[in-house]
């Protein structure tokens, strides 16, 4: 196959990609959920909608180390099996090189991203060697001011040198400042696997050293995971199964979620169970309703009715629905009396006794843009039909994000359908095939990270031991600051060392320019990763990790369904000088004098065998017979049956049947429509009952300078920022820029046409994006999909992120003092035509390098 450079590929495909992005910005129903082409030898083809791109995989300039030997490869030629967040794949290897990926034969909906997965080992952005920032190599921590600068040069060093430098920085930090100076509780989706998962590998090392400052919650779901334990006793309650929904639900409401897109991935790996259920729901003809400022890919596929409130105004719509049902005497008083606490307090707010404002549909119309008549009819429709509300997480990654889920729980309580087959709500139907019935598979553990220190801790702890997950910028910039958090006071420590592995905060954290300033504060930043993300470019020491194709591992199948186990078999040699995460941290442990404690004398295969055998023993205790490890490894996977009891699971059914015998883990044992505990915190941004708060930035706060509101939806072509450095992105970008979806009315007012390169600007930063004019986004709102790599460059217009990372624009403030979750869709912006030459995207190239 001929060599194809990234620039050549972009040039050749720019027109095609732009046309595709413009013509069909959400054509998921054609691409993700239908079956235009069957794949020979693929038995599930008629039931799944696999697409197998015809275009060849681009080849990068591949320079291998002398240790690479095709004779050593397990698969010089052939097929294997491994797993990624996008699913189980069978890599096809020719001449020691992956040339493609075949889907797993039991996958209901193979990912559209198989091409990008296959290309990942050869990405132009691959971290090829251990690298150290030149200024750091010369001046150490004194060089922090230039960390992350666009023209900062890097030096290739040996593994031994890189590990020595990293070990010295770690040792010095613990010796001089103690574990409270170590920000090691990284966040990110890393690679799947029970052994070479970067986060537990790093946590194990740092805990053996004495500990580190931890984090609570996730960027995905911090608000709901904090508020829902107060409301229903669990941050992520198990959902009623899809089997029950299909059988018993008369209406399904997709509120702020897009399961066709977001179920493409799984925290472990997936066989995409959700797809079969969506097909069955559509085939049955159940009416679905999508409540979202964007007409989602799911709504397109299902033919859903589309109700489109302004971003962040969903609690107002829900409150107005409650008002309407109360005013027409349609509330379920018996349910409220028996199963909830605090209806009287909430009702005072709804009817205006608390603040003098009645939460009528007319009130909500002025806020949300949804006509009052539609709010009324919607309220009565869901009251008159058994309705399952499927609420997403994007709706809580917005200012005051706790309120949407809490208000929906209140609405469902007023309807009285919680605990009934096909009724109530679920918070994870959009994630990891949530709602799939649990199999009988036992749990499989991973490399233990909660281990005791093996060296003395000589410095006293300063500050709090656990921080909110999204406090990283604030904490780095303001050591010693005291904040309110979930009823407690938290004090930021002073960080001297930041270690990040398998994650990219320069995409998932809001106000990216401010994060870049914060990353200049620590003495040392160490990053372990596969590719040159912006996070790696803001480090001092960078250690190259392997992709899942380049090592052995094992993992569960299905976070929600626990379908079974899959062997992750090495398909190719580690490329360049990359190493498996476990080997990297074992080598670091060796330099720190704690290798035996870290490895326990086990090789990678020893650990993998242990994980399986421990699960096998657990299965035996549960009456599940599993084959021995060698038999399992040879076959490559193991799937478990699902019982009828699990297939017919109804959320909160036990609680409804007997609330005294099965109380919720809340203050009252019931659903909390009012929480005395939260009220007792006296927060002005999260009261004792669900409330509508106007977002700090949104449609209601439009100004002449920034008249539009931003939404940052998930992209079907990557997972957060993963795969953005492969050719997959070219299927959804315009001249290598992230598309900006804009309503025809807003585009016309600005003289913008399809495919134009535009400047999108907020109070915090500016990005370049390619215009996609579509009526699938409401007027006054734009969409820039989340996950484009941060690529700031100096231009005549100032510093511009020329690739188009949505978080460059977003406000960095907590959702509230309760959850302190991150925002992703809170920003006022303006979109204008870019004038002059378009700056080149450079973030997928190797960084500037000094040859020594």
What are the functions of these language-model segments?
Residues 581-635, 721, 727-741, 745-852:
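Long, contiguous, secondary-structure-rich segments that constitute the structural scaffold
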Residues 321, 342-471:
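Active-site phosphate/pyrophosphate-binding segments
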Residues 136-161, 330-370, 456, 571-660, ...:
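N-terminal leader/propeptide and maturation segments of large enzyme subunits in energy/redox metabolism
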Residues 197-280, 284-291, 315-319, 413-537, ...:
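Extended redox/cofactor-interaction regions of prokaryotic respiratory oxidoreductases
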Residues 303-308, 563-574:
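Short beta-alpha connecting loops at secondary-structure transitions
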Residues 214-215, 331-334, 374-376, 388-389, ...:
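Acidic/polar loop patches that form or flank catalytic/metal-binding clefts of enzymes
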Residues 297, 533-567:
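Flexible glycine/proline-rich, aromatic-decorated loop/lid segments
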Residues 2-330, 371, 748, 792-852:
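N-terminal export/assembly segments and adjacent metallocofactor-ligating motifs
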């Amino acid at each position: 196959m001929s060599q194809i450079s990234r620039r050549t590929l972009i040039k050749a495909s720019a027109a095609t990609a732009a046309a595709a992005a413009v013509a069909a910005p959400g054509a998921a129903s054609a691409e993700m959920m239908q079956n235009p082409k069957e794949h020979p030898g693929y038995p599930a083809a008629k039931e799944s909608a696999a697409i197998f791109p015809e275009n060849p995989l681009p080849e990068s300039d591949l320079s291998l180390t002398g240790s690479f030997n095709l004779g050593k490869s397990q698969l010089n030629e052939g097929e294997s099996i491994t797993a990624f967040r996008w699913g189980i794949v069978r890599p096809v290897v020719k001449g020691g090189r992956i040339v493609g990926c075949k889907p797993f034969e039991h996958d209901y909906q193979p990912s559209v991203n198989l091409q990008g997965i296959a290309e990942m080992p050869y990405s132009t952005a691959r971290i090829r060697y251990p690298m150290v920032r030149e200024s750091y190599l010369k001046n150490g921590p004194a060089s922090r001011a230039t960390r992350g600068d666009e023209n900062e040069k890097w030096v290739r060093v040996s593994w031994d040198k890189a590990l020595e430098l990293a070990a010295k920085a770690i040792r010095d930090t613990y010796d001089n400042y103690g574990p409270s100076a170590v920000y090691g509780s990284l966040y990110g989706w890393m690679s799947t696997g029970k052994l070479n998962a970067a986060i537990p590998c790093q946590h194990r090392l740092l805990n053996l050293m004495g500990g580190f400052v931890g984090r609570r919650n996730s960027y995905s779901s911090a608000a709901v995971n904090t508020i829902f334990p107060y409301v229903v006793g669990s941050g992520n309650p198990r959902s009623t199964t899809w089997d029950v929904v299909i059988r018993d639900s008369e209406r399904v409401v997709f509120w702020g979620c897009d399961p066709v897109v977001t179920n493409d991935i799984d925290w472990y790996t997936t066989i995409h169970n959700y797809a079969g259920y969506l097909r069955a729901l559509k085939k049955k003809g159940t009416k679905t309703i999508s409540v979202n400022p964007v007409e989602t890919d799911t709504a397109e596929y299902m033919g859903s009715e589309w109700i489109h409130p302004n971003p962040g105004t969903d609690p107002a719509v829900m409150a107005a629905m409650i008002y309407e049902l109360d005013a027409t005497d349609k509330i379920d008083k018996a349910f409220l009396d028996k199963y909830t606490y605090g209806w009287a307090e909430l009702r005072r707010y709804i009817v205006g006794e608390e603040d003098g404002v009645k939460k009528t549909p007319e009130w909500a119309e002025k806020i949300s843009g949804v006509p009052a008549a539609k709010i009324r009819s919607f309220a009565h429709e869901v009251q008159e039909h058994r309705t399952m509300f499927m609420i997403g997480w994007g709706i809580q990654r917005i200012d005051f994000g706790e309120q949407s889920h809490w208000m929906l729980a209140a609405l469902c309580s007023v309807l009285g359908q919680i605990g009934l087959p096909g009724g109530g709500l679920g918070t994870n139907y959009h994630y990891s095939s949530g709602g799939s019935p649990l199999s009988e598979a036992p749990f499989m553990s991973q490399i233990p990270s909660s281990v005791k220190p093996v060296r003395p801790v000589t410095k006293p702890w300063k500050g709090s031991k656990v921080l909110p997950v999204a406090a990283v910028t604030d904490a780095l910039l303001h050591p010693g600051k005291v904040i309110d958090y979930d009823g407690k006071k938290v004090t930021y420590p002073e960080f001297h060392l930041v270690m990040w592995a398998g994650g990219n905060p320069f995409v998932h954290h809001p106000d990216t320019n401010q994060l870049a300033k914060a990353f200049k504060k620590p003495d040392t930043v160490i990053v372990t990763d596969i590719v040159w993300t912006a996070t790696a470019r803001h480090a001092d020491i960078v250690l190259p990790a392997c992709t899942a194709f380049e090592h052995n591992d094992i993992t569960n199948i299905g976070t929600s369904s626990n379908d079974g186990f899959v062997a992750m078999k090495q398909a190719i040699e580690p490329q360049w000088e990359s190493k498996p995460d476990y080997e990297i941290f074992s080598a670091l442990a060796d330099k720190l004098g704690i290798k035996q404690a870290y490895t326990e004398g086990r090789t990678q295969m020893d650990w993998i065998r242990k994980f399986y055998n421990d699960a096998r023993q657990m299965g035996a205790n549960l009456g599940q017979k599993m084959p021995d490890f060698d038999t399992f490894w040879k076959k490559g996977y193991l799937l478990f049956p699902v019982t009828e009891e699990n297939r017919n699971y109804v959320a909160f059914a036990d609680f409804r049947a007997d609330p005294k015998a099965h109380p919720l883990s809340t203050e009252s044992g019931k659903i909390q429509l009012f929480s005395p505990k939260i009220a007792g915190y006296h927060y002005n941004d999260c009261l004792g009952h669900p409330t509508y708060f106007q977002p700090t930035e949104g449609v209601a706060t439009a100004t002449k300078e920034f008249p539009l509101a931003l939404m940052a939806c998930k992209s079907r072509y990557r997972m957060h920022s993963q795969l953005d450095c492969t050719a997959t992105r070219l299927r959804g970008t315009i001249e290598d820029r992230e598309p900006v979806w804009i309503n025809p009315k807003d585009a016309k007012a600005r003289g913008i046409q399809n495919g134009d390169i535009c400047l999108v600007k907020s109070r915090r930063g500016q990005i370049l994006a390619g215009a996609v004019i579509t009526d699938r986004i409401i007027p006054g709102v734009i969409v820039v999909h989340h996950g484009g790599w941060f690529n700031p460059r100096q231009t005549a217009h100032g510093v511009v992120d020329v690739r188009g990372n949505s978080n460059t624009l977003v406000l960095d403030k907590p959702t509230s003092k309760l959850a302190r979750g991150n925002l992703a869709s809170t920003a006022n912006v303006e979109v204008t035509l870019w004038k002059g030459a378009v700056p080149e995207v450079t973030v997928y190239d190797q960084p500037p390098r000094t040859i020594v």
